[in-house]
A protein has these predicted regions:
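Short beta-strand edge/turn micro-motifs at domain boundaries
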Residues: 1-4, 120-149, 159
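Surface-exposed, polar helix/loop patches in the mature regions of secreted/periplasmic/lumenal proteins
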Residues: 1-5, 79-87
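Alpha-helical protein-protein interaction scaffolds
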Residues: 3-62
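Hydrophobic beta-strand segments of well-ordered beta-sheets in folded domains
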Residues: 27, 91-96, 128-134
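Alpha-helical linker/edge segments of TPR/alpha-solenoid repeat scaffolds
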Residues: 51-81
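Short glycine-rich, basic-tinged beta-strand/loop micro-motifs
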Residues: 86-105
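Extended alpha-helical scaffolding regions
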Residues: 98-101, 109-132
Length: 159
């Protein structure tokens, strides 16, 4: 579990997000469900098939709605990921390409300025999560064997 969120609780949150048209949040919960669905090889939730169907449907809807890459203003969005932390729980991550030097302090400013446009496209994230991470790359991270330079900007979603 993550921050005491079990798979049944994540399913409940995901269904609520889906019912309120917050697909991006729904996918975050589905991702977490997928990660924790089988806590051990011999353990299985009674409703596992229902959870698997929800996970697959959520991912499929996300993939059909968001044809990566796409532009939001002058930011080229290349992907969407999720990470977990012990303190903050689930953190949605928007991956994007930039021509700026990854050490340029303006990068954080530009990412924060794009917050409203990002949240409009990824509707619901500000309703369900405390933070959003914007992860910038100078080139498409397409080779799994290659190490890429990256710059992250944490955006607080709730005051």
């Amino acid at each position: 579990s993550i921050n005491d969120f079990t798979v049944p609780k994540l399913f409940e949150l995901g269904m609520a997000a889906k019912a309120e048209n917050r697909l991006s949040s729904c996918v975050v919960y589905a991702w977490a469900m997928n990660r924790f669905l089988r806590p051990a090889p011999y353990l299985q939730y009674i409703d596992e098939q229902k959870y698997i169907k929800f996970i697959k449907t959520s991912f499929s809807e996300m993939n059909s709605k968001f044809q990566f890459p796409f532009n939001i203003g002058d930011i080229k969005i290349i992907g969407f990921q999720i990470e977990t932390t012990d303190n903050e729980g689930l953190i949605p991550i928007v991956l994007y390409l930039t021509e700026f030097d990854l050490n340029d302090p303006e990068l954080d400013k530009k990412a924060r300025q794009a917050k409203d446009k990002i949240l409009k496209k990824f509707h619901g994230l500000d309703h369900d999560f405390e933070y959003l991470l914007m992860r910038a790359y100078n080139e498409m991270p397409s080779d799994p064997k290659k190490k890429y330079n990256v710059h992250g900007t944490v955006i607080k979603l709730k005051d």
